[in-house]
Amino acid sequence: MYHRNILIEQTDPEIFAAIQAENARQEHHIELIASENYASPAVMAAQGSQLTNKYAEGYPGRRYYGGCEHVDVAEQLAIDRVKQIFGADAANVQPHCGASANEAVFLAFLKPGDTIMGMSLAEGGHLTHGMALNMSGKWFNVVSYGLNDKEEIDYEAMERKAHETKPKLIIAGASAYSLAIDFERFARVAKDVGAIFMVDMAHYAGLIAAGIYPNPVPHADIVTSTTHKSLRGPRGGIILMKAQHEKIINSAIFPGLQGGPLMHVIAAKAIAFKEALSPEFKIYQQQVLKNAQIVAETLTQRGLRIVSGRTESHVMLVDLRAKGITGKEAEAVLGSAHMTINKNAIPNDPEKPMVTSGVRIGTPAMTTRGFGDEEARMTANLVADVLDNPRDAANIEAVRAKVHALTSRFPVYG
């Protein structure tokens, strides 16, 4: 028998120490990685619940195990809520991650050797959209689209390539593109060439849920997403679809790609979806967008170039070449100042992928901890202060002290 008062620190002091150190890092560092956020205590509690013990292969009301009557309730709530958020006909909440969701779509509609079209990773796409080292790039013939001279999606070139190559699947979505995507235009092209149209909205899902970024659901055959990032739920994936695709997608997830779903995570997804339906969530997302625009404007004023010239979302790419520093160096030195960021290639980047000429910045996490206009501007100036003098130890120490003063005023978990 287990006693509920047995704590991690008693069972495994080494893991406890690592968790405590990470807790401290999250509290005392400013999180600027666009794909990271802070889940609510309720979301985290669900993931630590006894639902982790339950096997539930299949779907609500159609399981291969007994004793699923209660986890059925949790999964059905998650399905109903995510459909309500995005206006979808049908939903699958079982994917373990965004990559699994994308792979399930490939399994449902494609055969090895089929042609797919996605945004080039080098110009803002995602590795699961056709990168050579990813399964999507190994199994399928990949045609990529990218940016024009204004660093905006080159819709004309995309349309021309689609008509030339007749892809079986067209993917819209990105991991490092700051502007609004014209999903309706993609849908028209896909219809013209007879392609399935899939949108990966993982980065933008929270903004879409709040109605402040274009919703792809009315236009796409299939929409995939993660449930963390801007949506602020547990780490996991979802697939939204037209009603006619529900059976084939569900079969692709189980038994095609996965076995037992993670019921504790699905319960956490349901909680996150309930949070996303609240008026407070819309206010939060509006501030995420406003903070991003303030950060972009402030960095521009401090002599840095924002790729595409602006942001219309939660994320931006920053070109560092004017400062004579690489993305790899910037990531390290900003980390020393207790601001967490990730190096990222910029369009036509002359540096290697593990070095890069840019960094990616996002505002979901800082906004979750309560940063508003003033704090967003302060954060951007602190980033610029570091990049102006990246090798000055006294400068880094001074910035770090300002970061700690700021984070102490805005704890993540009060």
From Swiss-Prot:
It is an enzyme of class 2 (transferase). The modification N6-(pyridoxal phosphate)lysine is found at residue 229. The keyword Cytoplasm applies. It is found in: Cytoplasm. GO terms for biological process: glycine biosynthetic process from serine; tetrahydrofolate interconversion. Its EC number is 2.1.2.1. Pathway: One-carbon metabolism; tetrahydrofolate interconversion; Amino-acid biosynthesis; glycine biosynthesis; glycine from L-serine: step 1/1. It catalyses: (6R)-5,10-methylene-5,6,7,8-tetrahydrofolate + glycine + H2O = (6S)-5,6,7,8-tetrahydrofolate + L-serine. (6S)-5,6,7,8-tetrahydrofolate binds at residues 121, 125-127. PROSITE patterns: SHMT (PS00096). One of its GO terms (cellular component) is cytosol. Its cofactor is pyridoxal 5'-phosphate. Its main location: cytoplasm. Signal peptide: none annotated. Pfam families: SHMT (PF00464). The record marks 228 as: Plays an important role in substrate specificity. Belongs to the SHMT family. Catalyzes the reversible interconversion of serine and glycine with tetrahydrofolate (THF) serving as the one-carbon carrier. This reaction serves as the major source of one-carbon groups required for the biosynthesis of purines, thymidylate, methionine, and other important biomolecules. Also exhibits THF-independent aldolase activity toward beta-hydroxyamino acids, producing glycine and aldehydes, via a retro-aldol mechanism. Homodimer. NCBIfam families: PRK00011.1. This is Serine hydroxymethyltransferase. It comes from Polaromonas naphthalenivorans (strain CJ2). The gene is glyA.
